[in-house]
Amino acid sequence: HRRYIELCPNINEQFKFFKRVIYENLGIIEFDTLIERLKTEKRALCIVNTKKCAQQLYEQLSGDGVYHLSTSMYPKHRKKILAQIKERMSDKSKSCVLISTSLVEAGVDLDFNSVYRQVAGVDSVIQAAGRCNREGIEKKENSKVYIFDINGMKTVPGQSLQSSITKGLLQDLSLIHIS
């Protein structure tokens, strides 16, 4: 008979902070549908798997309060854009939509009401969700992470296994206890 020591007492209380968003699987959607959804958002981050897709989305959405980040940009330029985004987001009355590649998933302190994440590995989806209701101030019902794939867009080489695992999990969200 073995004895176990609970390393994380009050586990439900400890992890309550991580249950600050609702995940929604949008499935396969059209590129134009994604654009229309993003146009209705007040504060949203959309992370796609390729620089080309990020650029195309940005060009379709471009306007006041729409920003684009990718690894194609020089670090100094990205830093300047991040500063502009933070400045804009400091005024709650202004909208802000950021189109990016996975570079914003870690090490970027931004907080959005909605995050759209193109299907990728589960770790990437979780990292993206970390940009939604980051402070835990908003109600969970107002903090959504939308997972989608774009109709006709090929999976990035090297990501097909991770993406297929995520797609399998998304078929039954109850398996991963995230809402």
Predicted regions and their residues:
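A short beta-strand-to-loop transition that corresponds to the Sensor-1 phosphate-sensing loop
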Residues: 1, 50-51, 101-103
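Interdomain hinge/linker at the junction between the two RecA-like core domains of SF2 helicases
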Residues: 1-37
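Generic structural signal for residues in well-ordered beta-strands
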Residues: 21-23, 66, 145
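C-terminal helicase lobe and adjacent C-terminal extensions/tails of nucleic-acid helicase motors
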Residues: 32-40, 47, 52, 56-62, ...
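Generic beta-sheet signal
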Residues: 42-46, 66-67, 95-98
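Conserved two-lobed SF2 helicase motor
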Residues: 91-104
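Phosphate-handling catalytic cores of nucleic-acid transaction enzymes
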Residues: 107
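Short Gly/Thr/Asp-enriched flexible loops that form oxyanion-binding sites at enzyme active sites
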Residues: 111
